[in-house]
Amino acid sequence: KNVEGNLVNYENLDNLQMRIHDYFKFLKYGYDRITDWCCWHIRRGRMNREESIKIAKEKGGKYPSTYLKVSLEKILNEINCSEEKFLEICKKFTNPQIFRCDNQGQPIFDKNKNLEKINYDNISEK
């Protein structure tokens, strides 16, 4: 089974905060470890761009509610942060040029606290 937020089962296992780090990378820049792995597979000829976009859309950027079977609440407790505060920080650093936002410019989270990118292939819509 793959590690949450990754395509493999052996990467980023050194501490539980790695998943939070990868999630903030997604919020700020629109890509995460899954995208990194897809790019590596494309460069090695193991996957094409269309497959990569599909995988990144399905598996990438998911809210880090658990990591390695540990709840986000427990991970955040270790750094003295509540999930409410974590969500505030997420909203503050979410790039509105990459993710769908409401009329006030606030990111729109679904019922699972996931965001929707405006464009998954990072090519401007015509």
Language-model regions, residue ranges each:
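Nucleotide-activated chemistry modules centered on ATP-dependent adenylation/adenylyltransferase
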Residues: 1-126
